[in-house]
């Protein structure tokens, strides 16, 4: 019997967990995403083209996180998967209590079910919260590796502000014109410009990391050819 699932997120890790584990998985029915942190992301749709047309022909609705208890009851949810960072332990466990009180299991997914393989060597740069300096550190690492004569690109967590998430499946920024072509917000431009202007480096972003690693960088990641 299928389990009904809600994925609790902020338009990043939540989509990734779905893509790598739940998409195409007939043992589960993801009835909704909930969202925080990204303005305007709630009350939108994770489109069928990304969700999988066979199991999710209408896509998956994204709701405000504040509606979580009523969504659990409405959709008879079995499990809620918490899938975003930048929150303290007290907040995460608070959501866990809300989920359990509404009658569902609270789940944190591990790396075995969510990591994707790359054909290229990877250096991961992470931090406990926003503003710790991941971007600056990444650019310094790229500078060092380029100095060694290596070809390097960056892959960044998406900032899915565009209402049509299909447009943000795979994004490639190699020059300033790409920022305009992708209709980047000011926040996105602040992130991508130092790579393409100052460092002359290519940066990838997008909703589907696996598609980026498998399709977006199958040949020369610098040229995209």
Role assignments for model-derived ranges:
Residues 144-225:
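ATP-dependent carboxylate-amine ligase catalytic core
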Residues 30-31, 106, 150-152:
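Hydrophobic anchor at the start of a short beta-strand
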Residues 47-112:
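Phosphate-bearing ligand-interacting subdomains
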Residues 36-59, 163-168:
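N-terminal beta-loop-helix "entrance" segment that forms/cooperates
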Residues 3-24:
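Glycine-rich adenosine-cofactor-binding loop
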Residues 114-162:
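Walker A (P-loop) phosphate-binding motif
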Residues 28-40, 155-156:
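Short internal beta-strands
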């Amino acid at each position: 019997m299928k389990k009904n699932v809600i994925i609790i997120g902020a338009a990043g890790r939540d989509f990734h967990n779905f893509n790598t584990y739940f998409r195409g998985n007939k043992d589960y029915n993801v009835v909704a995403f909930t969202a925080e942190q990204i303005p305007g992301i709630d009350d939108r749709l994770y489109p069928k083209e990304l969700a999988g047309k066979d199991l999710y022909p209408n896509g998956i609705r994204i709701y405000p996180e504040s509606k979580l208890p009523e969504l659990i009851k409405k959709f008879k949810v079995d499990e809620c998967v918490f899938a975003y960072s930048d929150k303290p332990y007290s907040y995460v466990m608070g959501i866990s209590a809300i989920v359990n009180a509404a009658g569902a299991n609270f789940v944190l997914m591990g790396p075995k079910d969510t990591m994707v393989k790359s054909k290229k060597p990877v250096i991961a740069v992470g931090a406990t919260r926003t503003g710790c300096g991941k971007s600056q550190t990444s650019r310094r690492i790229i500078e060092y590796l380029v100095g060694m004569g290596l070809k390097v690109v960056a892959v960044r967590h998406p900032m899915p502000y565009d209402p049509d998430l299909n447009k943000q499946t795979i994004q490639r920024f190699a020059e300033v014109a790409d920022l305009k072509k992708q209709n980047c917000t000011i926040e996105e431009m602040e992130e991508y410009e130092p790579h393409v202007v100052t460092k002359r480096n290519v940066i990838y972003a997008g909703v589907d990391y696996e598609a980026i690693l498998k399709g977006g960088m199958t040949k020369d990641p610098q040229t995209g050819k």
